[in-house]
Amino acid sequence: MRREAQTRIEGTERVIKDIDRTKLVEQQEESYQTIQSFLSKAKEALSARDLQRAYTLADKAYLLANELARSLPSR
């Protein structure tokens, strides 16, 4: 479970690193901030060895990040 959570965290970070926050509309910015919050909490849970919580938060962040990325115009 630890590996799965870490993989989701890393996957989310890969997705959001290419997002230009200056081009986000308000709703997209809110989603971006939610993703960052989920990531932060997932990392905290991982550090606390709360693996189920870490995975759940990381998975939510991952799904939301991919949804956000799909909503952006192609480069």
Stretches with model-predicted labels:
Residues 1-33, 75:
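Amphipathic, heptad-repeat alpha-helical segments
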Residues 26-38, 46-48, 52, 56-75:
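Short, charge-rich amphipathic alpha-helical segments embedded
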